[in-house]
């Protein structure tokens, strides 16, 4: 496991380096956003671009960029959206909104998804199972932004129960702020609930038909006891890594959902950096989203070995 983990981490770093390098070079091939001489930050931006070697060969520019990141953790300054401000400070300031909205979504979605999956598996080949399975496939097939518009139409426009967009401010743990987050939380939750429902039902259905479950029943355990003590424990080998992956991914947020509900998070910052365009912000966000995806994949893979000692990742035997 240790050897496998080290290999995965090294491959992750290599992948991250290649993706950042490709994005950096492709962006620097484009002309930098123009800055008016009348802008009060004109001299700062020009001096910064000179220091980062905008007039030098691309590989030299990339080397200067890597040196600034690794020696000073300096990702540059915004030259379009937040002119003159440090992009990493801007990024950190946007993180709490993204994390809190996605954390609410996960805490709401995982229990419901697992319970629906268990219920569907226990009612296999009944109308309840067919209804849950069909609804799950429909929900998974529909993009999250469709739910966002439906929620806004029904709960915000027609019923007037919820606001259209997230409340401004940083009072994240007040009732007013939580209420304003609910539409985004609901829109993010549908897909997660459906995913866990499908996974749980598939795994539990297979386990319930295993021979060891028949043996457990013949020893006098009721169906409920056998399911809770044995079947669910075996299902967790697949379900728990998915939960770990979801929790790692809470920082990534949702680009479209954050834009629709005006969530001041990193997702909306990413979209704005593309539209501006703001190249330093774009590079930092790209590195972040790539790193989160790679770390989540590694944690999911490694967690299999810790959950079930019989699994040895990377073993040739």
Describe every region a protein language model picked out:
Residues 6-15:
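N-terminal signal-anchor/signal peptide hydrophobic helix marking the start
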Residues 77, 133-195:
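Membrane-water interface segments at transmembrane-helix boundaries in multipass membrane proteins
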Residues 54-114:
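An internal, D/E-rich "acidic patch" concept
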Residues 2-3, 91, 95-128, 144, ...:
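Alpha-helical transmembrane segments of integral membrane proteins
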Residues 9, 44, 48, 58-70, ...:
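Hydrophobic alpha-helical segments of integral membrane proteins
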Residues 17-22, 137-150, 242-247:
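Hydrophobic alpha-helical membrane-insertion segments
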Residues 16-64, 159-177:
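Hydrophobic alpha-helical transmembrane segments of membrane transport/permease proteins
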